[in-house]
């Protein structure tokens, strides 16, 4: 019996294309991942990202949050590479992949219904990379399109663009060459009406340019939103009905009516612990009063607490009143200290209200640079910033867990804020690691880590170009569109507010921005105001607290830090310094006690716990690569005598010959009449022949030395 074969027909296949900043963006639907709730193959230039979205049929029980999972998955075959791991396959997500996942999650999460409890998974798999076309942009557009046309309720779509600044011009979706020279790297996500996400790193960019870039990106994003709406109009599915999270409105109304005065008194304090103690006591009163009437009230208490606190905080903030009594533009009490830990290379303790961060700086040789196995053409990572948020910082009684995405994200934000002010490798040939330990958290720990890390870097003697300060801006909006911004948000304002707009920078300009929202987006007016008030706050923090603590980087690194010395040799001499099988460089390391790292361009970095070892290693390398120069004087040792002349050692292993005719102005019958083995004499290089043989003159050297002495010049 013959085999029956039927050819698969993709009858539902559809494709849409638009121009995105001069390059084609294509979204294909109906050909891949057919069993997912929604899927698409997104092609931007030659960058290809497969996006699949799935939703569970039923809500997850026992949770009070929306269970959204976003995964940005890098495949190294996308750039024609085999993973460097032992198993030669992709393992846990790289840091850039984790940050890309957060980048997609943050603008989309607020646009899902607040009480939606069905699991939603968005998986973006990078399958091909064109470095001129960002995979993150393609992934976010694809995720937005898939969720929008799926049955999942979503208040989108959103679009996404990257913004650069090259040669004084704002550039949208810069290509690879433009990114290398761009002074800012900004990712903007937005709906047709409002901006929903900003993530930025910049080289001290003025606020006005940053704002102009965001506005320009939003105008272009509106075209993407219209493009996705066209797709939804053609293939969009009916939105699913879902079980709304249960809430007892009747119980809540009674609590508000009976306990408003007590609740306001509980909230009105700058001490987080006092507030929580008061609130817990009030919840006990709720039990006493309502448990008999509402025996199932425990399941609603958390939501009642959230709504009640938000009601009070929102009303107060709209009136210009804050829970701790501050004005809208008032920063909590600050303290800064350096040199906190005695034997580390640098440390800084920064305290803002009940938020406290200890940052510690460690210096090492460039061999300690981090190597990343990612889809990006990134060189070794010289500066590493790690952020730790232990449970005790918020008073939780549990064991610490492994690093989570939030910690990765906050560390990356601080890193992005500080990289623009770091010295070049030539100026400061060290690998630098800063660890920010959150000791106490009541809001804005990421910005505290930026301030504390600036202090630690300066304490460590890192010659940063300018100190960096970070501050956050909050937002509350009324139903009529009126709004109130406020500076330096604390925990309760972050929890119940609608925005956490983090800005870091120097007095010259912005170095980093991260904007997180809990609403449907920001108008341009709000963004402009947030940039203005955070600028004033940065200046105040620098002038009044950080610079009085330490006005400039220390002139020397810590005595406990490795000493570094950099030198440059002819690249052709590298093999001589390394030696066969590394024998020469191993000998240098063993005899000097210093470590030696050699780059392909001939740059050599020497490191040791003490300067003497560095100098010894440098002297040995200088000897190995020594090349005599014609016309120069050298002081050497006579090591061999032949009938026709004497051989003089200019450096270990480097000899030259003084012909008998070059020993004196008169005729010399015997070499030993002028010099003997072991004599230290001055010689002048007269010639280096095509075979590399060095010819010397003793008599010319004597004449030149006499002339210099007569002229009062020293001979070295």
Residue ranges and their predicted role:
Residues 151-267, 457-555:
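Mobile "lid/hinge" segments at catalytic clefts and subdomain interfaces of large enzymes
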Residues 114-120, 155-157, 224-242, 273-274, ...:
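Flexible, glycine/charged-enriched surface loops at secondary-structure junctions
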Residues 44, 53-55, 72-74, 124-128, ...:
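Flexible glycine-/small-residue-rich
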Residues 124, 196-201, 242-246, 257-266, ...:
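Short, hydrophobic beta-strand segments
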Residues 24, 36-121, 126-128, 133, ...:
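Glycine-rich, flexible beta-strand/loop modules in the N-terminal catalytic cores of phosphate-handling
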Residues 2-56, 241-377, 562-576, 584, ...:
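Extended amphipathic alpha-helical scaffolds
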Residues 2-243:
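Long, basic N-terminal domains or extensions that often function
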Residues 560-562, 566, 571-716:
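Single-stranded RNA-binding regions, centering on S1/OB-family and related RNA-binding modules
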């Amino acid at each position: 019996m013959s085999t029956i074969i039927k050819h698969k027909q993709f009858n539902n296949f559809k494709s849409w294309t638009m121009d995105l900043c001069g390059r084609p963006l294509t979204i294909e639907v109906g050909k891949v991942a057919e069993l997912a709730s929604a899927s698409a193959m997104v092609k931007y230039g030659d960058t290809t990202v497969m996006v699949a979205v799935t939703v569970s049929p039923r809500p997850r029980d026992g949770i009070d949050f929306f269970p959204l999972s976003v995964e940005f998955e890098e495949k190294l075959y996308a750039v024609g590479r085999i993973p460097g791991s032992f198993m030669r396959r992709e393992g846990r997500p790289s840091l850039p992949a984790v940050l890309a996942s957060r980048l997609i999650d943050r603008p989309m999460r607020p646009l899902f219904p607040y009480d939606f409890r069905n699991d939603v998974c968005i998986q973006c798999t990078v399958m091909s990379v064109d470095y001129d076309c960002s995979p993150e942009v393609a992934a976010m557009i694809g995720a937005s399109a898939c969720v929008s046309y799926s049955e999942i309720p979503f208040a989108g779509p959103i679009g996404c663009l990257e913004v650069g600044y090259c040669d004084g011009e704002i550039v949208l979706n810069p290509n690879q060459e433009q990114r290398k020279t761009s002074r800012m790297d900004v990712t903007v996500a937005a709906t047709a009406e409002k901006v929903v996400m900003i993530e930025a790193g910049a080289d001290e960019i003025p606020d006005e340019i940053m704002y102009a870039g965001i506005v320009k990106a939003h105008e272009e994003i509106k075209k993407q939103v219209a493009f996705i709406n066209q797709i939804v109009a053609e293939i969009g599915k009916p939105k699913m009905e879902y079980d709304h999270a249960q809430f007892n409105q009747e119980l809540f109304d009674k609590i508000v009516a009976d306990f408003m005065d007590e609740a306001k008194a509980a909230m009105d304090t700058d001490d987080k612990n006092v507030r929580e103690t008061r609130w817990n006591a009030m919840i006990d009163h709720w039990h006493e009063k309502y448990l008999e009437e509402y025996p199932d009230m425990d399941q609603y208490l958390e939501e009642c607490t959230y709504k009640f606190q938000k009601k009070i905080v929102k009303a107060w903030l709209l009136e210009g009143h804050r829970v701790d009594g501050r004005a809208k533009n008032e920063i909590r009490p600050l303290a800064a200290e350096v040199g906190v830990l005695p034997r580390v290379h640098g440390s800084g303790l920064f305290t803002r209200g009940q938020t406290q961060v200890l940052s510690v700086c460690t210096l090492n040789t460039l061999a300690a640079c981090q190597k990343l196995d990612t889809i990006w053409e990134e060189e070794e990572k010289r500066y590493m910033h790690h952020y730790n948020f232990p449970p005790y910082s918020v008073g939780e009684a549990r064991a610490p867990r492994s690093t989570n995405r939030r910690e990765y994200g906050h560390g990356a934000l601080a890193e992005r804020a500080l990289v623009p002010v770091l010295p070049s490798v030539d100026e400061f040939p060290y690998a630098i690691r800063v660890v920010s330990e959150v000791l106490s958290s009541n809001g804005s720990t990421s910005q505290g880590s930026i301030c504390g890390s600036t202090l630690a870097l300066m304490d460590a003697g890192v010659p940063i170009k300018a100190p960096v300060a970070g501050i956050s801006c909050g937002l509350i909006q009324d139903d009529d569109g009126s709004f109130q911004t406020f500076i330096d948000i604390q925990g309760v304002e972050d929890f119940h507010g609608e925005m956490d707009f983090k800005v870091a920078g120097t007095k010259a300009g912005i170095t980093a921005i991260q904007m997180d929202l809990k609403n449907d987006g920001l108008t341009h007016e709000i963004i402009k105001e947030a940039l203005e008030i955070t600028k004033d706050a940065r200046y105040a923090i620098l002038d009044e607290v950080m610079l009085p603590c330490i006005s400039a980087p220390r002139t020397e690194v810590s005595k406990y830090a490795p000493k570094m010395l950099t030198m440059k040799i002819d690249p052709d001499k590298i093999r001589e310094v390394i030696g066969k099988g590394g024998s020469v460089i191993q000998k240098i390391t063993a005899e000097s006690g210093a470590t030696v790292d050699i780059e392909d361009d001939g740059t050599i970095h020497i490191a040791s716990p003490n300067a003497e070892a560095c100098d010894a290693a440098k002297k040995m390398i200088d000897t190995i690569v020594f090349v005599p120069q014609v016309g120069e004087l050298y002081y050497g040792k006579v090591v061999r005598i032949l009938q026709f002349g004497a051989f003089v050692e200019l450096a270990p292993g480097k000899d030259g010959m003084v012909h008998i005719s070059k020993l004196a102005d008169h005729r010399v019958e015997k070499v030993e009449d002028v010099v003997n083995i072991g004599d230290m004499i001055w010689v002048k290089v007269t010639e280096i022949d095509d075979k590399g043989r060095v010819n010397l003159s003793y008599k010319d050297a004597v004449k030149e030395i006499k002339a210099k002495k007569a002229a009062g010049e020293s001979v070295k």
